[in-house]
Amino acid sequence: MTRVNQLPCDCVSTAEESLTSGTCITPTHVTSLSSPLDRSGDVDPLPVSDESGGSKADESMTDADETKKRKRILSGDCEADENNKSDGEIASLNDGVDAFTAICEDLNCSLCNQLPDRPVTILCGHNFCLKCFDKWIDQGNQICATCRSTIPDKMAANPRVNSSLVSVIRYVKVAKTAGVGTANFFPFTSNQDGPENAFRTKRAKIGEENAARIYVTVPFDHFGPIPAEHDPVRNQGVLVGESWENRVECRQWGVHLPHVSCIAGQEDYGAQSVVISGGYKDDEDHGEWFLYTGRSRGRHFANEDQEFEDLNEALRVSCEMGYPVRVVRSYKDRYSAYAPKEGVRYDGVYRIEKCWRKARFPDSFKVCRYLFVRCDNEPAPWNSDESGDRPRPLPNIPELETASDLFERKESPSWDFDEAEGRWRWMKPPPANHEQRERMKMAMTCLLLFVLIILVGSSSILYQY
């Protein structure tokens, strides 16, 4: 067997080209080793130059500034940067562009390669626009357009808009247009710690009603959004997109007060809020507008025709007067792509434009139907734009051709869009709440009694003469 002798090197090695033994402290030449040394985990040494030395010797620079300057020295752009812009401007500009580019590449729709509109995120993590996703599924494709992973049947039949991703897309759009900005991130509000819990004992925990504190100061029959002046806890009001774990916590913030009923209102006064939960297959939900089915009188009347009475009449009164109705979507809505994945979510105020009755099936009982159209100044949770709603034409409803008892508003609505101010507001005075109505009734009663006393006194005086 031939033995390979390691001949001594005839050149003087530098410190970087020698390796010191850990036992005998004998330097070994790296170039003389039989196999190259694995230095993948070592940190590359910085080149020694006058500029880098000056940067290191500058005690006024922080470690972060020193690291950024060394990176520019290695890239060879130091002189050009110093001639044009300052260190902080270059760093912030480069970081912003790199972050925006990286985020856009990760968020883009797998089909149109644009920032997704009403994004749908599948299990593999890739995103689609809701329209692109529906079109992709309608073409018979049930795999991801990027990684070819299988899309589950349940997700293909009922996609859900990723409202968490909407906030990120809003931030990206603001950063792209303005460079600096803040997006509306909506917190998941929970009321589970502290004495404000909705239960105290095991018996009360079943209903979660005992000692449930109401955080806002609006009356129970308040119409429209809940502004900041009625929020003494946070001083911001209830924002569009806020979520809660259940309807009890939603009630504590005054958005929808009934624990069970999906309609909050009074027959002779109007409806203040509705909850989209469960629903029927023919209840269309397109986000900015949806079709809503009325409420039966009870379990024993489920197979009878619905009438415009009780809570159904409250919805019709809101349609007639043009009142804003708060809308809450629940995760229990199985047929909507705009329902949250968990809990309940406040989606803003809508206006009822039309209501009618129709038979759900041939020779079946009639139900009350309502057309809700969004009219809020805040953007919807699924909309990546920063602006609110604008007046839009009413959608075409095919079922109106066979509908009966169609009701449409004839007068101008109380809640309407002000072109001069560019926002939705009360164009007519809002309706008086229950306490104000009771005071008015009491005042009218006292006035009538006073007039009656005067008339009786006058008649008695005339009778004496």
From Swiss-Prot:
Its EC number is 2.3.2.27. A zinc finger (RING-type) spans 109-148. One of its GO terms (cellular component) is membrane. Pfam families: SAD_SRA, zf-C3HC4. Its main location: nucleus. Residues 233-374 form the YDG domain. Pathway: Protein modification; protein ubiquitination. It catalyses: S-ubiquitinyl-[E2 ubiquitin-conjugating enzyme]-L-cysteine + [acceptor protein]-L-lysine = [E2 ubiquitin-conjugating enzyme]-L-cysteine + N(6)-ubiquitinyl-[acceptor protein]-L-lysine. One of its GO terms (biological process) is protein ubiquitination. Residues 31-69 are annotated as: Disordered. It is found in: Nucleus; Membrane. It is a single-pass membrane protein. It is an enzyme of class 2 (transferase). The RING fingers are required for ubiquitin ligase activity. This is E3 ubiquitin-protein ligase ORTHRUS-LIKE 1. E3 ubiquitin-protein ligase. May participate in methylation-dependent transcriptional regulation. Mediates ubiquitination with the E2 ubiquitin-conjugating enzyme UBC11. It comes from Arabidopsis thaliana. The chain crosses the membrane at residues 442-462. GO terms for molecular function: histone binding; methyl-CpG binding; methyl-CpNpG binding; methyl-CpNpN binding; ubiquitin-protein transferase activity; zinc ion binding. It comes from the Eukaryota. PROSITE patterns: YDG, ZF_RING_2. Keywords: Chromatin regulator, DNA-binding, Membrane, Metal-binding, Nucleus, Transferase, Transmembrane, Transmembrane helix, Ubl conjugation pathway, Zinc, Zinc-finger.
